[in-house]
Amino acid sequence: MDIGTISSRYAKALFSLAKDKEQESRVYDDMKMLADSFSMEPELRGALSNPIVSVPEKVKLLTAAGGIEVCELYSRFINLVLAHKRETLLPFIAYIYIHLYRKEKKITRVRFDTAVAVDDAVKSHLQDKLRKETGCTIEFSGHVEPELIGGFRLRIGNYRIDASYATQLRDIRTGLLENR
C-alpha cells in the first residue's frame, strides 16, 4: 500500500474520533508539536525506525515530542500506531491531520517576512485585513530576514507576494545584464 494512503487513513480516523470526542483542537496542538519535533530533530525519525529502541521508549519519545502534557487520545493513538509498526508514518500522519484540521476549521496559514522587526499593531492590522479578505481564521507567523534589505515577503496558502528590495534589486540587475 501507498505511504500516503495509509497515513491518510490513520489521520482521518484520528480526526474523526477526536471530532466525536470534541478533542480535535487538543489533538491538533499535540500533532503540531509532533510535526515540529520531526522537522527540528531529524534524529527522532532515526530513533523510531531503529529496531533496538523498545516500544515503551518510542512511546516516551513521541509523548515528549507531543508536548509537556498530551491528551489521552493522542497517547492512545501513538500506542496504536506503534502496535501496528507504523511509526515511520507518523510525520506524514501528523501533517495530514494538521491539514484536515485547518481545512475543517477554515484556518489559513500566513507567513510574513520582513527585513526588520515589525510592531504588533502592524501585524494585527495585517491579520485583520487578511481575515476579512479570506473569510478564514489566520494562523500568522512573522520572521525577520535581514537579507530582504527592505520591504516584505508574504505567503498566504499557495500564494506568495514578494515585495522585498532584494528581489527588486535582483530583477534590475538581471534586466541590466540582459540588455548589455
UniProtKB/Swiss-Prot annotation:
One GO CC term, this protein: proton-transporting ATP synthase complex
Protein's membrane topology: Peripheral membrane protein
Superkingdom, natural source: Bacteria
PROSITE patterns reported for this sequence: ATPASE_DELTA (PS00389)
Predominant subcellular localization, coarse grouping: membrane
Entry coiled-coil feature ranges: none
Keyword field: ATP synthesis, Cell inner membrane, Cell membrane, CF(1), Hydrogen ion transport, Ion transport, Membrane, Transport
GO molecular function: proton-transporting ATP synthase activity, rotational mechanism
Compartments where found: Cell inner membrane
Family: Belongs to the ATPase delta chain family.
Role summary: F(1)F(0) ATP synthase produces ATP from ADP in the presence of a proton or sodium gradient. F-type ATPases consist of two structural domains, F(1) containing the extramembraneous catalytic core and F(0) containing the membrane proton channel, linked together by a central stalk and a peripheral stalk. During catalysis, ATP synthesis in the catalytic domain of F(1) is coupled via a rotary mechanism of the central stalk subunits to proton translocation.
PANTHER family, per database record: ATP SYNTHASE DELTA CHAIN
Assembly and oligomerization: F-type ATPases have 2 components, F(1) - the catalytic core - and F(0) - the membrane proton channel. F(1) has five subunits: alpha(3), beta(3), gamma(1), delta(1), epsilon(1). F(0) has three main subunits: a(1), b(2) and c(10-14). The alpha and beta chains form an alternating ring which encloses part of the gamma chain. F(1) is attached to F(0) by a central stalk formed by the gamma and epsilon chains, while a peripheral stalk is formed by the delta and b chains.
Record's protein name: ATP synthase subunit delta
Species for this entry: Parabacteroides distasonis (strain ATCC 8503 / DSM 20701 / CIP 104284 / JCM 5825 / NCTC 11152)
